[in-house]
Amino acid sequence: MDHPKLEEWKTVWRERRSVTMVYILLRISVVLVMLAQIFNGNFENVFLCVLTLILFMMPSVLEKKLDITLPNTLEIIILLFIYAAEIMGEIGAYYVTFPYWDTVLHTLNGFLCAAIGFSLLDILNRHSEARFHLSPLYLAIVAFCFSMTVGVIWEFFECTMDQLFFLDMQKDTVVNTIGSIMLAPTGGNTSTVLKNITDVIVVQADGTQTALGLGGYLDIGLLDTMEDLFVNFIGALTFSIIGYFYVCSRGENKFAKRFIPVANNSTRPKDAPSETPEKNKIE
C-alpha cells in the first residue's frame, strides 16, 4: 500500500500536471538565460531574471495567503505573462522587435487584473461574515473598474519614469497630422491643423539645426498611452463578461471555471440564512 503522503503527491500531480510542467520549463529557461547574462557581465538582466523567478512564486503565495485555488489555465496565463514581459520583452527585446508585443501584454494585464479584482470580491461576497452581497452585474462592473484603475496607475508610473529618468516607457509614435491651439495665429482657443508633416527639425540653443529624418512629427507617448488603456479596457471587459456568466450560472460554467479562482473556505454555514437581507443586498 502506498504511503499517504505519496498518494497525496500523486493526486496533486494528476490535477496540476500541466501547471507543474510549464512552471518547471519556464524556471529552467530563466536560469539558463541568467547564466548567459552573468557570463556576458550584464547584471541588469541578471536582476530581471532573479525578479522573474520571484514573480513565478506569486500564484502560490496568493493561493496560501487568500486560501484560494487558482485554475490551471489562469495560473499558466499568469506564468506566461511574467515570462513574456520580463524575459522575452525586456531581455529578448521583443518590445522593439515586435511592435504589438506591448499591446498584447497590456491586453492580458487588463484580463488578469480583472480576474484578481473579481476573485477578491467573489471571495468576500461568499464569505460567511460578509455584510453585503453584490449581484453578478455589480461584481463584473467592480472587477472591470479595478482593472482599469490598475491600468491608469501603471500609466502614471510610466509617465513618472519618463519625466524623471527619460526611460521612454511611453513609446513615441510618428504622425503626419497634428492639431493644436498653441499654433493658432491669433492665440485663441481654435485648433490649427498641420497636415502632411514629413520631418522634425530640432533647433538647439546655439542655433544648430538637426533634421531627425523621422518621416513625420514625433508624438511623445500620448497615442501609446491611449492604446495601452484601450487594450486594457478590452481585456478587462472580456474577463468581466466571463465572470458575470460564471456567477449567474452559480459556478457551473465550464469555460469560465478555467479563469475564476475558487475560495476554499468561503461558503456560508448551513445555519446561515439562504437569502441575504435586502438592506445589505446590492443588485
Where do the language-model regions lie?
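Cytoplasmic-side transmembrane-helix entry/capping segments in multi-pass membrane proteins
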Residues: V50, T69-L80, T103-H106
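Alpha-helical transmembrane segments of multi-pass membrane proteins
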Residues: F56-S60, F81-E86, A143, S147-W154, ...
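Interfacial helix-loop-helix junctions of multi-pass membrane proteins
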Residues: I91-D102, M148, V152, F156-F239, ...
